[in-house]
Amino acid sequence: IHLQLMLRRLKESGEDDKLGKSLETCIKEVERLDGIIAHFLEAIRPSEPDFRETNLLDLLEETLRGREEELKARKVSAQVEAGAKDPVVFADPEQLKQVFFNVIGNAIDAMDKDPKLRVITSGDDENVYVQFVDSGVGIAKEDVPKVFEPYYTTKKGGHGIGMMIVYRIMRDHGGDVGIDSKPGAGTIVTLRFPRKDRRMRLLEEAKT
């Protein structure tokens, strides 16, 4: 907050553009560190899901809007293909936003030349599926199981807990996550969510 106040006052005064850029860099670094700390806290002290009716398509679009500047900066073409009819599940929307945020972030980091990200929703009577299809470097078959292990990462500066959090949240929601990938052919991350009525049945059965 103090850095942001200093930057605003500096801009208002019209003084020292070089110092202003340094302050902007400091603010971005503090925000990055805040994100890392938040991830670690979520990993070691997970919160209980606050279940409610949640439209996955609305949540996906909201998450993509939140990463719009990053997508533009990295020149990523992101497309949502809505194939699921009534993609409403019984879930914690804030936790699912974290899932989408982490998966999309991994896809962005994995892509370089002509980056394309497709987000596809589909469904059947029991489940709703969300697939993230990227045009990135891919993952070797022997490394795929390691993705969900704590602190495993191939990214420079990565902390290796993002997909572990994804796995835990999906498990807590009665769903699961799968990865299909190979080097040079991109990666497909598939999230499976039980439909609203099925999730409520599972909760009732767990109480009896």
Where are these regions (language model features)?
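Short beta-strand/loop element within the Bergerat-fold HATPase_c
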Residues: D114-E126
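Conserved catalytic submotifs in the C-terminal HATPase_c
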Residues: R52, K72, S77-P87
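Detector for a conserved hydrophobic position within an alpha-helical segment of the HATPase_c
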Residues: M170-R171
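A conserved beta-strand-to-alpha-helix junction within the catalytic ATP-binding
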Residues: R52-L64, G123
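Conserved micro-motifs of the catalytic ATP-binding
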Residues: S47-P49, V88-A91, T154
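Short conserved segment of the HATPase_c
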Residues: I139-Y151, A206
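Histidine phosphotransfer helical core of two-component systems
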Residues: I1-E31
